[in-house]
From Swiss-Prot:
Principal place of residence: nucleus
Protein encoded by which gene: Brf2
One GO BP: transcription preinitiation complex assembly
Region (Disordered): 317-385
Location of Cysteine sulfenic acid (-SOH) modifications: C358
Subunit structure and binding partners: Component of TFIIIB complexes. The TFIIIB complex has two activities, alpha and beta. The TFIIIB-alpha activity complex is composed of TBP, BDP1, and a complex containing both BRF2 and at least four stably associated proteins; this complex inhibits the transcription by pol III via its phosphorylation by CK2; YY1 facilitates the TFIIIB-alpha complex formation. Interacts with TBP; this interaction promotes recruitment of BRF2 to TATA box-containing promoters.
Region of interest: Interaction with target DNA: 108-114
Provenance organism: Rattus norvegicus (Rat)
Protein name: Transcription factor IIIB 50 kDa subunit
Chain positions recorded as Zn(2+) binding sites: C7, C10, C28, C31
Region (Required for interaction with TBP and formation of a ternary complex with DNA and TBP): 362-416
Length: 416
């Protein structure tokens, strides 16, 4: 309190100095009355020690969100609400977009890529919370190109240093199969094609697990194998009415896109089922093919663990067996094997190798032939190559004497 002054309103002596911008004021701390007010500076000499402040720094102009960023933030929130995601997911996706927008590689990108960033942030949030959402579903909602979306997704994950777990295959099956329009009768859906959702989902899960155990899923996009498994599950529940329906027509009835490799995955899955069917006693008498084996998928899935062990053998075990075979060949010849004593036509078929399809049918690669080396006989023979042919000490001594005689003959001048 300077000089014992008091507040003229309340009479309090609790006066404090308060610097309001460039003015120094004396204010009562009890009632807030301004007792004295400083004088504004009017001369340049009084402002000699002050610093100028730019307009953008004083008003916070640079901290404002641009129109494009505001539009994309609204799109992030709208996309989360369309997908019916929880509020925490929406907040996380918005924060990821704000971080991604600060990256130079994203801010300077094309408009097509910036529009994809919205879906990438939502997909990252769903993957981190184990929410079943596919990249194809996001691309369909945003009308985005799948290649651009996948490359942008990987770039954002790498630049932000995020830990994104892979989507659980069972959750993906449930989410993807729920989009099939096969569970309610409609004018475009015949009654014989309508199926119970729970039955088809449970059988599809078993078929996808079988495909995973037999290396059909590893390193491949999951949607084609899920589409093929769903088609087989749907056919096997009522085979008499549905065996004539093709995969393309099935996808058209279900109102889903047919993935390009789905037909190949279907043939691979049918080949596995045929191999398993050959191990069941009551199916060995039947001549099953890739069409008739669909009728017995229920029995094959019921005993799939045992049938996979019987129908296939591990590729690593096969290699070890081949290495151990020369060691025990003498003992096998003495004891004899009853299998090889049977006639050739009655021998049981050896189990197939349980290996990925890329190893069972490797792609053809062009091999360049090495250039043919023409040997004329006039090539120089090095000393190291000659030493390889000298076996005994006597040969070494004879070779040294021959070399000495040759040098002596070369040093003798020719007679006149």
């Amino acid at each position: 309190m300077p000089n014992g002054s008091r507040c003229p309103d309340c009479g309090s002596s609790e006066l404090v100095e308060d610097s309001h911008y460039s003015q120094s004021q004396l204010v009562c701390s009890d009632c807030g009355c301004v007792v004295t007010e400083g004088v504004l500076t009017t001369t340049f000499s009084d402002e000699g020690n002050l610093r100028e402040v730019t307009y953008s720094r004083s008003t916070g102009e640079n901290e404002q969100v641009s129109r494009s960023q505001q539009r994309d933030l609204r799109r992030v929130r709208d996309l989360c609400r369309i997908l019916k995601l929880p509020l925490t997911f929406e907040e996380t996706a918005v924060s990821y977009y704000q971080k991604a927008y600060q990256l130079s590689g994203i801010r300077a990108a094309r408009l097509q890529k910036k529009e994809v960033v919205v879906g990438c942030c939502v997909l990252i949030t769903c993957r981190q919370h184990n929410w079943p959402l596919t990249m194809g579903a996001i691309c369909t909602l945003l009308y985005a190109d799948l290649d651009v979306f996948s490359s942008t997704y990987m770039q954002i994950v790498k630049l932000l240093g995020l830990d994104v777990p892979s989507l659980c295959l069972a959750d993906l099956v449930k989410s993807y199969c729920s989009s099939f329009k096969l569970f309610q009768a409609s004018p475009s859906m015949p009654a014989k094609y309508v199926e119970d959702k729970d039955k088809m989902l449970s059988r599809t899960l078993l078929l996808v697990e079988l495909a995973n155990e037999t290396w059909l899923v590893t390193g491949r996009h999951p949607l084609p194998i899920i589409t093929a498994a769903t088609f087989l599950a749907w056919q096997s529940l009522r085979p008499s009415d549905r065996l004539t329906c093709s995969l393309a027509r099935f996808c058209k009835l279900a109102n889903v896109d047919l993935p390009y490799p789905a037909a190949s995955r279907l043939q691979e899955l049918l080949a596995v089922l045929l191999q398993m069917a050959s191990q069941l006693a009551w199916l060995q008498v039947l001549r099953l093919d890739k069409r008739s084996v669909v009728k017995h998928i229920g029995d094959l899935l019921q005993h799939r663990h045992m049938l996979v062990r019987m129908a296939f053998q591990d590729g690593t075990a096969e290699v070890e067996t081949k290495q151990q075979q020369p060691q025990g060949r003498g003992q096998q010849e003495e004891v004899g094997d009853s299998t090889f004593d049977l006639p050739k036509r009655k021998r049981p078929a050896s189990p197939a190798l349980l290996l990925p399809p890329c190893m069972l049918k490797p792609p053809k690669r062009t091999h360049t032939m090495p250039p043919d080396s023409v040997v004329t006989g006039d090539e120089d023979i090095s000393d190291s190559e000659i030493e390889q042919y000298l076996r005994t000490p006597q040969e070494v001594r004879d070779f040294e004497r021959a070399q000495a005689a040759s040098r002596a003959a070369m040093s003798v001048p020719n007679p006149p």
